[in-house]
């Protein structure tokens, strides 16, 4: 065996024997870590005294033993062994340096650099220069290749710490000054700055955090004895807005928007352009409809109400109202403007009645309708349009279903059952025309007549005589027609109502 190898092995064994912590220790099988030795726990805590020249460790008992310092250890032939040196040096102490240049942080170094300046302010380039000149670790790291890392760390610390403030430099082309915050500032890092447009601004966050606290004061207290009917009962002033907002969102609106009062910008006063459905229904439905039975259709009830206000006036009042279309009705004894009603109840859908579109009527039927307590069936109240060729005749009311014995005073009778034509205006009665009396031979025929305003006949008038404004003798003088021809034409042509009153050759 080589004597050099034997010497190195002996020296290594001697060095390992110096540390008593590596001796075998007995412990129970249940323990995974050796128990503390009682002789180590009983030793005093005074540090040992070591003479640097002799390299001896002096114990409190007075005896000393020579030790080998790490600096005086002979190196083995194979070079230093890391395991042996680590065993000699032992674990690192708790007071070791935090960074490569020492225990000071970047912020502390920057603070020292700024405080060392005469004006207590430095530019970024001056801070770099102070670091390279003062701190030994950065002396050989001033070039551009090796300074990128620590210079970037300095810029981050200047921006993120509130103890440093940036002051504008008045000199042209110079960077800003960095100074210590006179208010002290926090030593820790400030939160990273965000863009002003982001939702995480501190002002909005403070407002959101305070909003729940203001909720009891914003909400109006309900009156005593009142019970809330809906979850949005407290927000009655939101008349135009939907009720889908929850209570918290509504509170946010009332908290952040108290100043806006215009209809364009304020949610609390915005009104819907649509009228409430209850108001529209209240205006469209007449008050008298509710007095009829529920089984009667509303349209028939409206027609009966119109019949209640029929006024039969003289013929001179017809010409003054020639511009009206439809029926102008006014209740007897009631003053005020006349209410104009469309003829959609009684006439087909072609349009309202105009001057010259006529029907036939009898005073008995009118009186029966006006004095009847029960509404007649819809088949008894019918209406039709007559071809415009009859523009010289006034507007007349056709009542179907009358008994065949009821004759008009002038000789015009109504058929019990009207005939149906294929067209929409299909109800045309069979008329038996009788020559008018000679007294009315010279009566002029008006060219255009307005819609008559009908009034009930007076008590003195005869029940069997037609009113003067409805007398057909004054309008139908020398009028000859073949009703068979008319009915056949109506049946053939359908909607095209073409009346021909010329006599056949």
From Swiss-Prot:
Subunit (UniProt): Interacts with CREBBP/CBP, CTNNB1, MYOCD, SIRT1, SRF and YWHAZ. Acetylated by CREBBP/CBP and deacetylated by SIRT1. Binding of YWHAZ inhibits DNA-binding. Interacts with USP7; the interaction is enhanced in presence of hydrogen peroxide and occurs independently of TP53. Interacts with NLK, and this inhibits monoubiquitination and transcriptional activity. Interacts with FOXK1; the interaction inhibits MEF2C transactivation activity.
GO molecular function: beta-catenin binding; DNA binding; DNA-binding transcription activator activity, RNA polymerase II-specific; DNA-binding transcription factor activity; DNA-binding transcription factor activity, RNA polymerase II-specific; DNA-binding transcription factor binding; enzyme binding; identical protein binding
Organism lineage: Eukaryota, Metazoa, Chordata, Craniata, Vertebrata
Gene name tied to this protein: FOXO4
Keywords, alphabetical: Acetylation, Activator, Cell cycle, Chromosomal rearrangement, Cytoplasm, Developmental protein, Differentiation, DNA-binding, Myogenesis, Nucleus, Pharmaceutical, Phosphoprotein, Proto-oncogene, Transcription, Transcription regulation, Ubl conjugation
Extent of the signal sequence: none
Species assigned in the record: Homo sapiens (Human)
Superkingdom of the source species: Eukaryota
Effect of residue 32 to A: Abolishes phosphorylation. Protein is located mainly in nucleus and shows increased transcriptional activity. Increased transcriptional and proteasome activities in embryonic stem cells
Stretches with biased composition (Polar residues): 1-10
DNA-binding region: 100-188
Protein name as catalogued: Forkhead box protein O4
